[in-house]
Amino acid sequence: MSNTPIELKGSSFTLSVVHLHEAEPKVIHQALEDKIAQAPAFLKHAPVVLNVSALEDPVNWSAMHKAVSATGLRVIGVSGCKDAQLKAEIEKMGLPILTEGKEKSPRPAPAPQAPAQNTTPVTKTRLIDTPVRSGQRIYAPQCDLIVTSHVSAGAELIADGNIHVYGMMRGRALAGASGDRETQIFCTNLMAELVSIAGEYWLSDQIPAEFYGKAARLQLVENALTVQPLN
């Protein structure tokens, strides 16, 4: 046991940043509601940072904060604030002003090229063939996600479709993020912190012991999460 009641350690977390391009709270509220409806398992009750650097018109910050919070998102800080008065209002509400890393200047867009003839159809799968490390979040919108390497604890895989992990799975896997209850999770070594299909989830201690560390397939049966051997 430590001799001190607390211990400070550096750490890193992956957070979504909502860039506000409109100063009207009602417009922001509706836009966020629409976005959350597209991927409720991914965004519902998610912690977010609000970036206000693009706001040109004055904003009622109290109303804006209420509009965002009413969607279920949890505002944990604000970035991109250069206006002294707005900064004072934000800090008065107890929210920290955060500094984001410097963004690289965008490279000039390449000259447009004529479309190639006889192009092959796009495959609805996102493939990751490198290890997914702690703090990384990978999202595969409207498709399946395949990872051919290990997924570390603290990493997060999210897909609107199925998730396949052909390595040790220690992180979090959320399939069917947009609500598709027919999606499944396939792991060759199931040691996940959390598994979820369309919002139905298990934490690591809820995974049946006989499947922990084994090849497994997870799916919903009668709206309940189930697991079986992966043959």
From Swiss-Prot:
The keyword Transmembrane does not apply. One of its GO terms (biological process) is cell morphogenesis. Residues 100-125 are annotated as: Disordered. InterPro entries: CAP/MinC_C, MinC, MinC_C_sf, MinC_N, Septum_form_inhib_MinC_C. Keywords: Cell cycle, Cell division, Septation. SUPFAM superfamilies: Cell-division inhibitor MinC, C-terminal domain (SSF63848). It comes from the Bacteria. Interacts with MinD and FtsZ. Belongs to the MinC family. Cell division inhibitor that blocks the formation of polar Z ring septums. Rapidly oscillates between the poles of the cell to destabilize FtsZ filaments that have formed before they mature into polar Z rings. Prevents FtsZ polymerization. This is Probable septum site-determining protein MinC. It comes from Escherichia coli O81 (strain ED1a). The gene is minC.
